[in-house]
Structures are given as structure tokens and as C-alpha cells.
Amino acid sequence: GYSIKDSSQTKLLDYAASNIQSSYAYSIVPVGDGQMLGIADFLADKDAKLVAYRKVEPGEVREKTVLTYGTLQLDDRVKDAVMQFNQNNTQYEIRFKDYSEEEDPETAFAKDVVSGNVPDILDVTGMSVRQYVEKGLLEDLTPYYDQDEEVNVEDLIPSVAEAMKMDEKYYYVCPAFLISSLVGKEKDVGANIDWDVRQLMQFADQHPSARLFYDTEKKDILNILIAYNISKYVDWKTGECTFDKEEFRGILEFCNRECDSQDGTENEAELLRNGKVLLKPVVVGAEDIEIYRAMYQDDIAFAGYPNEQGRGTYFVFQHQLGMSSQSKNKEGVWEFLRMFMKLDYQGKIQDVNEMNAAAPT
């Protein structure tokens, strides 16, 4: 509140303490007797809601066991889920440890790990999950799945469940996924392509009047090819790196030869339709398939990136959330993690996703 008389300010509402995500709460007005009304538009719901807020004295607030949520990049959807968990759970409350606010986020996180100050909930999205597993940092969630009457591994898409598994165990939950691949016209790449780098270079030779990619720099394709196959070059247990294999030399040759960046002034969709550009690196969800079919104006195929195994289409997991093996409140952590895998949450994923049309797991 603001006083015109003396220009003083008075806190009327504490968003964080009230478990309100300010970016989705608006038009809040006082209606007297310590109450306020406002509109809340949660990501997890399709419709806005009228919400009543009531002032509570500190002594009336029930104490809860605090769970810490550690992340290098805080996502609005997770914030929304945490707020709803805090509102509905009478025993536990989650508080954020956002390492992105630190000058060196990864170093700050590493220091907490070394000192034993590990958050209860770990957001390992895009991180080296296997490395954390081998260090014993993540709890095996398989027993929690097995004992849960509502959330089961059997409910996951089989191929997704297999990709999430490490040494026959599950170390994180993941509510949604995308697909990373190379897309092209089916008549060019074939309906079922398994190729290595040499075969992809031969494919390029068969189309001398076209280029493989529209405007993709060498370093970007190199990064993708290494990132998706990093375990072939790095032994996380010993720290030994092997970059002198024939396959890796082939990758370097491929990137140097086929990935020259263009000026990007030409119309990409037109070049794809006319066969002047053959492939496009994409990260897609289920609804995006029709978009690319319309872009090509033809039947399309997801050919995948080249590798020696011939399986170069990869899952991109959104929100990989794990449990610290050092947590003293593991049951509470599971109460939060399981929320993402329940049917009611899974059923709303495609309705609320603002980026790609991620598919529920």
C-alpha cells in the first residue's frame, strides 16, 4: 500500500510467502476485512480463476518441513507446480535454491555437493545425469515407482521409459519430451534411414546441386553429434577421453565439408520445397510434424543424425527432476516428483506448453 500523506509504503501481500507466482496473478484488489480478490492464470490450467486471498497472522501459519529445490535454470512451469504443491500439501513446503543467481552457477552447485549441502530436489535438465548417478548423488527412484499405487513405470511410453533407464534403474522423473532429429523429404532420404557419417556424405554427393543444410554452422552440428554420443568418447568413471577414433575423424571431416554457413537471406521453406536444401535439424513435438509437412509440401521422414549404430533420433527430456540421495525427507520429495507423472498433470501438458508441442511421457 502507498500513503499519499507521508509517501510511505506498507507491504500488504507477500507473493513468495503466500505461494503465489506473481507473473500469473493480476488485478488483485482489497475488498476489506483483510481479504483481497484477484485473477490467477496458472500454466497447469486452461482457464483463469477468481481467487480470494485472506490475511493470516504469522501465528496461524502451520509449520511445514522444508524441501529445497536446486536448479541452474528456474522454469515457469516448475515454479507453477511448486506453488500449487505448497498450497495443497499440509506437511511439506518447497523453497528454491536458484544457482543461476550465482556468478558461477555450476561452481556454486559443485561447492554445495562437496560440502554436503545438496538440495533435496535436483533439476538435472540438460546436465550429465550419468555423471551424477556414478557419483552417487541421485537416489534410485525405481522402488518409489514400484510402491506407488497410482504412478507406475508401466504407464510410460515404452521407448521413453527405456531411454530414461540407466543400469536398469530410474533416477529422475520427466513429464514431457521432444524429439531431436534431421527431417527431409521421404522420397529423398527414404522412409527408414539408418546412416553413419560416410553414408550421409554419400547422400550429399548424390545431390550435387543441393546443399545439406540451410544455415547451420559447423560448430552447431559438431556440438550435436558429440553431445548425443559423448559417452562414446568420455569414460566418466576414469576421466579418460578418446577422440582419435575413425568415427570421430569422420565427424570432423563431415562438419568441415558439409556445414558451411550461408548468409540466411534466402527463403528457407522455399529452398526445402524445391529440393535446394535437403535436411533441417529440428527439435519437435507431436503437433510440429504437420508444420514441417506443410513446409516441405510433401511427405517427410525423420532421418536422424548419423552415428555408427544407425539410430540418430534422440529424446529431449523436459524437466528431468531427481531426488538427492542425501535428502532426509525422501518421502516428501517423492510426493512432489510423482505429481508430474500423475494422469491429471500429464493430460494438461500439450494444452499449456508454450514452446514446442511437447508430448507427455
Show which residues each predicted segment covers:
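Early extracytoplasmic/lumenal segment of secretory-pathway proteins
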Residues: 66-129
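Hinge/lid segment of periplasmic solute-binding proteins
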Residues: 127-181, 198, 299-306
